[in-house]
Amino acid sequence: MRIVLVGPPGAGKGTQAAYLAQNLSIPHIATGDLFRANISQGTDLGKQARAYMDAGQLVPDEVTIGMAKDRMAQADAAGGFLLDGFPRNVGQAEALDVMLKDEGVKLDAVLDLEVPEDEVVKRIAGRRVCRNNSAHVFHLTYNPPKAEGVCDACGGELYQRDDDSEETVRTRLEVYHTQTEPIIDYYRAQGLVVTISALGKVADVTARAMEALKASDEG
């Protein structure tokens, strides 16, 4: 299957993408991984991306599209893929359609992970990270430390990252509504959108997604 995964920040896209890709035996292609790989390997696209990032500018669509095209041309993606973080706007979605058409294939589904805005804020703003080890992550509601403000693993101080503040989260949601939500309308017009609730346990959401994808494939 060829799938695009969409959803607001805090919807658990990365987690679900990993499980779904494994269950479907297709590669999980994440924008962040594409950028890191191209930059670390010193590709032409990586150098272009690095120059924009170092200048504090947004990387142009054509660079991101080029990276995605190169990745989808690799052998492991011949039978399908799961895109996470791409396309990010309608222009990228249109470019993806052209790419796939040139290869004589098309998308099978666009999986939309739906989470209420207040839940997104709660999920992200509740995170607390250890100052000694950023891999030690807690949550005030879902995974609270035994002692308030103290890391269970090493006793380090727990703090809220700037990116996790409610103000920042709401700004990110605004960007999502403005830039990424129109993609859902674009694909809905093609009859590709499959919407599921991303509330509940990770395994339950994965099962819900697999069932919805199977139904859309059969339909």
Swiss-Prot record:
Pfam family of the protein (one): ADK_lid
- Binding annotation for AMP: 31, 36, 57-59, 85-88, 92, 161, 172
| SUPFAM superfamilies linked to this entry | P-loop containing nucleoside triphosphate hydrolases
For this protein, the parts annotated as crossing the membrane are none
Task: Give me any GO biological process, just one.
Answer: AMP salvage
Annotated InterPro entries: Adenyl_kin_sub (IPR006259), Adenylat/UMP-CMP_kin (IPR000850), Adenylat_kinase_CS (IPR033690), Adenylate_kinase_lid-dom (IPR007862), P-loop_NTPase (IPR027417)
Q: Which residue stretches belong to region NMP?
A: 30-59
Q: In which pathway does it act?
A: Purine metabolism; AMP biosynthesis via salvage pathway; AMP from ADP: step 1/1
Organism domain of life: Bacteria
Query: Where is this protein chiefly located?
Result: cytoplasm
User: Whom does it interact with, and what assembly results?
Assistant: Monomer.
Similarity comment text for this entry:
Belongs to the adenylate kinase family.
Q: What does this protein do?
A: Catalyzes the reversible transfer of the terminal phosphate group between ATP and AMP. Plays an important role in cellular energy homeostasis and in adenine nucleotide metabolism.
In Swiss-Prot or TrEMBL terms, this protein is called: Adenylate kinase
Organism whose genome encodes this protein: Streptomyces griseus subsp. griseus (strain JCM 4626 / CBS 651.72 / NBRC 13350 / KCC S-0626 / ISP 5235)
Gene designation: adk
